[in-house]
Amino acid sequence: PMMERICELKERNYRDKEEFDYAPQDYADAMDSYDKILEITGEITGETIAPNAEGVDEEGPHCGNGRVEYASGTKQNLDAMVKAGLNGMTMPRRFGGLNFPITPYTMCAEIVAAADAGFGNIWSLQDCIETLYEFGNEDQHSRFIPRICAGETMSMDLTEPDAGSDLQSCLLYTS
């Protein structure tokens, strides 16, 4: 089946099993890992993220001392996801990731977004690291990817002429 082939390619025929004790041994083991991560994601969303959603909307982020701080519920949500090892899901294990194919990651993202779409957007910023992984050099990989997998940093920065990062001031014209 197609998912079996995807796993073989992503896992490079399961060669990480010699170096990482949590790497799958074969296709069945990989699918079991994905199922467990989906279960863990469901537990976190049901026990932490969904109950925090309304309070996060009411509190909102805060700006002080030149920094934006997330609402306390958002911080709790992020802490729970990081503690469960759910950052850097698609990144290689050598950087602290889970080396998952995009399919189980996307399934987790859907579960998270169903509980709190705003938090789903924040948590899924981890997919931005795919660009650095694909096009960055080894120095960039070693400096940034482990920190993202550990939940220490992540952002998405936008810029447009005459608007900077102010998305509401961006204009789009089609022809």
Spell out what each predicted region is:
Residues 151-159:
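A short, Trp-centered hydrophobic/proline-enriched beta-strand micro-motif
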